[in-house]
Each structure stands twice: as C-alpha cells, then as structure tokens.
Amino acid sequence: RVARGLLTQFRPGEPVAVWAGNGPDWVLLEFAAGLAGLTLVTVNPAYQAEELAHVLGHSGAAGVFLRSEAQAEILTQVRDRLPRLREVLTLGDWPAGDGPLPEVDPASPAQILYTSGTTGQPKAAVLTHRGLTNNARLAAEAVGLRAGDVLVNPMPYFHVAGCGLITLGLVQTLGTQVVLPRFDPGRMLELTERYRGTVIGGVPTMLTALLAAACRAPRDLS
C-alpha cells in the first residue's frame, strides 16, 4: 500500500530522500521505496541547512520525507537551491494509491548513502538492490544470526549498518528488530531485558557505553 502510494508522487528510478531518525515508519519507507523502484537517499537527521542542501542537490532528490516543523524550517532556507525537489512529505503520512508495482531490476540503485565528509563534502555511495540484500545476508551469516533472534538496533538508519546489515539481515534470517529511536545505552539494555534480546550489536564506543551502563544499573540479560 505504501509503495503504491509513493508511485502517485514519484516515478520509478527517481531518488527520494528520508531525513529522519529511527522509527518503524522509516523501515516502512525503506521497503516501500524498494518495491516502487525508487532510490532511497538516506540523510543524517543531524544535518543543518548547508549539509542538507548538498546531499539533496547532489542526489537530485525529487522528494524528501521528514518529521518535524523544525526540519521543515531548515529546508525552507535552502529550498530555492533545489530545483529538482518537487515534494516535501511527512514521514508516516503516506499518500494513497492502488496502481501496479513495477518490476525492479536487482542491479538498479536501491539506496544512496553519504559518507561522513571528514575530508570534504559527504560523498555518495550507491547501493544496488542485489548488493544491499546480499551484503546483509552475508553479514548475518558471518555473525551467526538465526531464526528467532531478537536484536535492539542501536545503529542509525541513515547508516548502512542500521538500515542494511541489521534491518535486512534480521528479515532474511527471520529475526526480530526492536527499534531504538536513538542510541541510549541504558534504554538499550532495558529493552534488551524486556524483549529477551539474544544478540547485541554496535560500534566499539557503543559497546563501551553499554558496559558502563550495565555497571551502573545491572540488567538480567541471561
């Protein structure tokens, strides 16, 4: 339903950006964009006007999904520099549609993710449908994900680890993802205890923070 709604606003092959933090609606958009043959441009929700203008302009995004009025105000500052941007939509407020879905080429672009830009402007990394899903499958196999595993995802969705390796890896192994809006070590341990998490993932600084939080407020993670 969401994919069909997207096709009332965009044409298959067009880039569509998502500028928002983690949430179930983000994942819905990820899958719907793939089904609709759109290229999802993932945007760091911490971006300010100039960074946002660079990513939206460079990718040629035809639309952007966002959540807050504050984001809309930031976008207004650079909107006149983005001639290809037609639509500004609220994430979760899906357009209605009932048309057919296209046949999507596995070699076509699925997502455009941007690097951190530590030595200059963020650079685009284009991921195909086949590459994205195979990478997630191989990563899941490498860490030993199994059917029934539960993981509280601490990684941001604008990063390939969050939206690709973990999200798609769990889907392919019939696991369960608990969505964490943003990394909070105490909250992550609380949810891991509540939902009986079987796997913990994250970058080293996150794991260090989790160990410190567990010392302050121990949880039953058995």
PLM regions: where:
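Conserved pre-ATP/AMP-binding loop-to-beta segment of ANL
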Residues: 97-114, 120-121, 144-150
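Short secondary-structure boundary segments
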Residues: 67-69, 182, 204-205
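Conserved AMP-binding A3 loop
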Residues: 110-137
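Conserved S/T- and glycine-rich ATP-binding loop of Class I adenylate-forming
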Residues: 16, 33, 64, 109, ...
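Conserved helix-loop-beta element of the AMP-binding
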Residues: 60-63, 80-89, 150-152, 198-202, ...
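Short beta-strand->loop structural element characteristic of the AMP-binding/adenylate-forming
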Residues: 17-19, 26, 30, 34-65, ...
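Conserved AMP-binding/adenylation subdomain of ANL enzymes
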Residues: 133-150, 158-199, 207-209, 213-217
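Structural core segment of the AMP-binding/adenylate-forming
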Residues: 4-9, 35-94, 100-102
